[in-house]
Amino acid sequence: MVHAFLIHTLRAPNTEDTGLCRVLYSCVFGAEKSPDDPRPHGAERDRLLRKEQILAVARQVESMCRLQQQASGRPPMDLQPQSSDEQVPLHEAPRGAFRLAAENPFQEPRTVVWLGVLSLGFALVLDAHENLLLAEGTLRLLTRLLLDHLRLLAPSTSLLLRADRIEGILTRFLPHGQLLFLNDQFVQGLEKEFSAAWPR
């Protein structure tokens, strides 16, 4: 099961950019409770805990992405927004997976699958035993759909104004955090359904 999906900023490697990694969008599937914690579980406290956990994942993804780009020896990709007509080569984008130990930051061990596309990072937080190939394929599909339908890399794109469209894509392609085995024909059908509900 997927526990969270997030989109966050990526800073350019080899720069002295002191800006912080920012979570632009996150969706948590199911809540995590700590049975050993004697403090009351209020809605506000749970929300802050989830926010801290998601930010910790985003920072680690950003760090992994920067390390991978530096280690590859390739020149850093231009992180400036592109025109909406340009296709982004997802097969060349930095990607990876890593494990999170229990209590760091989640109660249970988790696996994170991530993909860095220019100035944006996309990540899925999964159960530790989840199918990584299926998760990577799902993340690539979600990323492609979000980039195509929402034009996320175009200048002046605001994710805050498009949260309902992101949720529409997640509802169809990652329902309740469940990874789906999808063939191309089924994906095309879901894309047509989404396009009819949310015209570009």
UniProtKB/Swiss-Prot annotation:
GO BP, sorted A to Z: double-strand break repair via homologous recombination; endosomal transport; protein transport; vesicle-mediated transport
Transmembrane annotation, as ranges: none
Membrane protein topology class: Peripheral membrane protein
InterPro entries: AP-5_subunit_s1
A GO CC term assigned to this protein in UniProt: late endosome membrane
Keywords, alphabetical: Cytoplasm, DNA damage, DNA repair, Endosome, Lysosome, Membrane, Protein transport, Transport
Localization terms from the record: Cytoplasm, Cytosol; Late endosome membrane; Lysosome membrane
Principal place of residence: cytoplasm
Purpose: As part of AP-5, a probable fifth adaptor protein complex it may be involved in endosomal transport. According to PubMed:20613862, it is required for efficient homologous recombination DNA double-strand break repair.
Quaternary organization: Probably part of the adaptor protein complex 5 (AP-5) a tetramer composed of AP5B1, AP5M1, AP5S1 and AP5Z1. Interacts with ZFYVE26 and SPG11.
Protein name from the UniProt record: AP-5 complex subunit sigma-1
Species annotation: Homo sapiens (Human)
